[in-house]
From Swiss-Prot:
<dbReference type="GO" id="GO:0016020">
    <property type="term" value="C:membrane"/>
</dbReference>
<keyword id="KW-1133">Transmembrane helix</keyword>
<feature type="transmembrane region" description="Helical">
    <location>
        <begin position="88"/>
        <end position="108"/>
    </location>
</feature>
<feature type="transmembrane region" description="Helical">
    <location>
        <begin position="22"/>
        <end position="42"/>
    </location>
</feature>
<keyword id="KW-0472">Membrane</keyword>
<feature type="transmembrane region" description="Helical">
    <location>
        <begin position="55"/>
        <end position="75"/>
    </location>
</feature>
<keyword id="KW-0812">Transmembrane</keyword>
<protein>
    <recommendedName>
        <fullName>Putative uncharacterized protein YPL238C</fullName>
    </recommendedName>
</protein>
Length: 129
C-alpha cells in the first residue's frame, strides 16, 4: 500500500528492475518525502523557511539519480563480470546533484535552529566531498 502511495515499484522481484522506470519512481518518491521532511523542519510561515523548503526538495529529487546509480552498481549482476569493478557509472550531473543536496542539507539544517549556526568545519567537510 505504501509502495503505491509513493510510486515505488516492488523491489523484491528482480525481473521488473529497469533503470528508466525506477528513475522516475525514485524521483517521485524522493520529492514527496523531501516535502514531508522539510515541512516538519520548517513549520513556520516565514519566507526564508519556504524558500529553504523549495530548494531542499528540488535537490533531494535531483539526488535520486545518484542513489539509483549506487543501487544498480552494487546489485546489478552485470557488474560482477565487469573488467573494471571500481568504475562507478556516475554521470557528472548525478555527482553534482548529490553534492548539491549535501551542501543544502548542511546549510539548512544548521540554519533551521536559531540557537545553532553552521560551523566552519561542517562546511569544509561538505566542500571537500
Amino acid at each position: 500500500m505504501l509502495e503505491l502511495a509513493l510510486g515505488v515499484p516492488s523491489l523484491l522481484s528482480a525481473s521488473t528492475l529497469s533503470r528508466p522506470a525506477l528513475a522516475s519512481s525514485f524521483s517521485n518518491a524522493s520529492t514527496l518525502l523531501s516535502f514531508v521532511f522539510f515541512f516538519f523542519f520548517f513549520k513556520d510561515s516565514s519566507p526564508k523557511a519556504s524558500a529553504m523548503s523549495s530548494v531542499g526538495s528540488f535537490s533531494a529529487s535531483a539526488s535520486a539519480e545518484t542513489l539509483l546509480d549506487f543501487f544498480f552498481f552494487f546489485f546489478n549482476p552485470a557488474n560482477k563480470s565487469s573488467p573494471e569493478p571500481f568504475s562507478l557509472p556516475f554521470t557528472a550531473a548525478s555527482k553534482s546533484s548529490g553534492i548539491t543536496f549535501l551542501v543544502f542539507f548542511f546549510f539548512f539544517s544548521a540554519g533551521s535552529n536559531p540557537n545553532s549556526a553552521a560551523k566552519s568545519e561542517d562546511i569544509s567537510c561538505v566542500l571537500i566531498i
